[in-house]
Amino acid sequence: MEPTPPEGPWAERLFPPPTDHGIAEPDRAATNVPSGTGTDSGDVAGATGERWYEGGGRIGEKAHREIVIYPPTRGLATQGDPFEPVKIGVLVDMDIGQLLADWLDPTILAIEDAMNEGVYDRPVQLVVADARGLPRENFLKCRKGYEWLVDQGCVVVLGPMISDNCLQLQSLINERHCSSIGWTGAWRFSSDYCFTVANGDIPTEGVMCAQWLAGKGFKKVGMFWEQGSSGRDYADFFREEAQRLGITITREVRLGPNPRGLVDHLSAMREAGSEGIYYGGYGYATFHFAKAFAELGWDPPRVMGTAFMFYSNSNEWAAGLEGWHGVDQLGEDGANANYNAMIDRFQKRFGRVSRNVVVALAYDTARAAIHGIANAAMATPEEVRNGLERIRWMPATNGGPSCYVQFGPHDHKGYKGDFLTIRELRDGELRFDGYHRPEWPSNG
């Protein structure tokens, strides 16, 4: 008599098995969507950027939540079982106007480029969380967005972008052991699992602006700084450098995101003999300066930190920054071969032209992520962190021709070299003003 087979219960798979998306190509990397955003009609407010430095997307467009990229097969015969894509999180933590497509599309391009170069030969999935937090929305949204990405199995997260959210997430990131590659220039955002391919460097920006004003021969300047996680750092480093250089601050004003009394403050600065103006902060307040200067009929030399690059967020924001010099990241026009070639590939891949700083920043960030994954012993967050620290002298599309990305133990600030520049926005033209390369006074 044969034994009666048991009737269970059976141990079923807790999670579904990997599936092949069926999109792989023999000679090039392939993605399941034509671009990172799905808006391709006129049913969204706003329009594409009118000038080369403005955002190339549409205000209000949405991201595909899941974007899958396959490496070229190049005739490889597998054992038949599909590999599950390694997941990279994208944390959208702020309103970015016309720039969402200019973040996601270069991210796709960077991963496709790396796969075409043979850097990594396993599928990758971008998982997008739109979880906007500080300074305009509640802090908890961004925290939950990051945790959701980690719970989805992401091995690294691109973002947050801004200082408030990077700093408020820092302890959580270290606790969850899933590295963030943020864009913040906050000097305090650097710890075990916190990296940056940064859209600036707040202390350095304050010093750069003071040195720029001194280089123009100014002895009296007015100073604005914006309330927020990094506002005091902007103020402190500028103030200390201005004092060292013999600059007198005629009036110091702390601004809220929606500033009050700008005309009165500027009028008082002019009456006090201010020869130039400095602004340091997140950037919300900068939207209002053009109107205030026009009302006064005053056009003094003025300089700000990387909030200047909000010119790419929306066409209206660019108009608000008319007449300012600011800390930028794009190098001298035509000088960075990596930037020029990437822009050509971008146009060929996505059928549109967009050359603003976010395109370069997004590309460099995604390159860091995919190379960190490729360097890792296995696709876990802890090993990807170690893989990021192995990146050495990686070419950068941002900055000048000498800019590169490099990490190491206790060195999680990626950009090295000429990654900060000075530009001026005037009469609708974004003009390169120079690299900032100070010299010792003793040089004569």
Residue ranges and their predicted role:
Residues 1-444:
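Extracytosolic ligand-binding ectodomains
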